[in-house]
From Swiss-Prot:
Name used for this protein in its record: Chaperonin GroEL 2
Gene Ontology MF, one: isomerase activity
Single GO biological process annotation from the record: protein refolding
EC numbers for this chain: 5.6.1.7
Principal subcellular localisation of the protein: cytoplasm
Amino acid sequence: MAKQLIFDQQARTALKHGIDTLALAVKTTLGPRGRNVALDKKWGAPTVTHDGVSVAKEIELKDPFANLGVQLLKQAAVKTNDVAGDGTTTATVLAQAIINEGLKLVAAGANPMLLKRGLDKGGQALVARIKEQAITLKTRDEIRNVATISAQDAEVGELLATVMDKIGRDGVVTVEEGKSTHLEHELVEGMQFDRGYISPYFITDSARMEAVLDEPYILITDKKISAIKDLLPILEAVLSSGKKDLLVIAEDVDGEALATLVVNKLRGTLNALAVKAPGFGDRRKAMLQDIAILTGGTVISEEIGRKLESATLQDLGRARRVKADKDNTVIVEGHGDKQAIQARIAQLKQQIETTTSDYDREKLQERVAKLSGGVAVIKVGAPTEPAMKERKARVEDALNATRAAVEEGIVPGGGVALLNAIPALDNVTTQFEEERMALNVLRRALEEPLRQLATNAGEDGSVVVENVRNEQRKHNNNHYGYDVMTGTYVDLMQAGIIDPAKVVRSALENAISVAGMVLTTEALIVDAPEPKKKNGTPPMPDDDF
């Protein structure tokens, strides 16, 4: 296919046009006094959003050369969202500021490769300074403040603080669309997996359509149980112990084995419940091992030379309660050894750090949460569908920001952490003039998020930046900054205006990375448009038959 090419200043001008177009749409959403953006959908109601990455993902320009600039800048927002889950607008604002200042230097004759080298050196120093500023997240109030700032909603902040209190910092929180007009949350006590009872005959509470066992024995196996001879020894052992409650977790239970369990349940001889094992393949084996450790049992598997008929009471797990409906089973307060459970959690956390797959990481985090007994569901409601989707996006941002804050700590918000990092550039050693120029570009760009926050609040950005510096000198306190909601200069940490260090760091790293790519681009290549076909009527065949 034929290609179109443009070079040098013409290429950089096209990139700049695309970058400025995207940034203009995204940066209007920055801060608590930023505006919303409405996104048209081909079907359904339009989406109204305050989320920078949602706006960025929607933008495609007709001009293919300018669109390359859009796609490059979009990477700063998307990558920041992937790593930290928030801070996408900050990344876009920083990247645009670095690119615009850098392009002026390139147009004046500066070497782009040396500029990039200076940006990379400065970036390393700035990231180190941001990490130095970070304070470990300790109190419930700090968690609430992080969530409130990210969602720009005090109710969301309070709810997330409450949920994190109850499920712990290793817990899993999922966000769903609710059916009411307000926020709701559910806490799942114990380990839940998405397999329900095999037969409705196991139900003990017909009003709730649930099967409930108190202090049951738990048989865990990865094989299919069809023959009664496989189950008979363990059934006799359970009954001889004086207990009647038994949970069977297996690949499947059918045939005479299922019939025997159901008949004994109906006669009242045995209060049994059979459920299928969760997951598939290797993940199933791992999850069965999790259940065994949680309940103090053993997985009966032919892979380790154990047959089902050889199982004894010592191989069975125990729990305070088991509850199952047609879709889910919950094991509450397993009797497993606490040290073994903690060792398993530590092992899973190690796997989380080493895995490169986002899907595997998510599944591992779920397993950690289930072992530590913390899973919560937040249901987001609103009067209309667009409002509900917009609020759900903000709740997800707040959740990601809270997790990031737990991970790497917190820094002063309102763009002040970046402002406070600027002196770190004074200690960077440079070899070439362009490297020194790049450090000056960063000095100017790091002020831009604060300028934009002030601009969105209707203030003069440059005046606010200068006033913040004066207030910091006056109070000898680097935590002073501008509260855009009240229009006053306050100690941001005391006022609860804080950002996760991971979010600020990721935004800066990705902005510098994208800016370096743009500044060192000398040629653009895109597909040439195909010539339009003429709308003539095709000739008719001869009627000679």
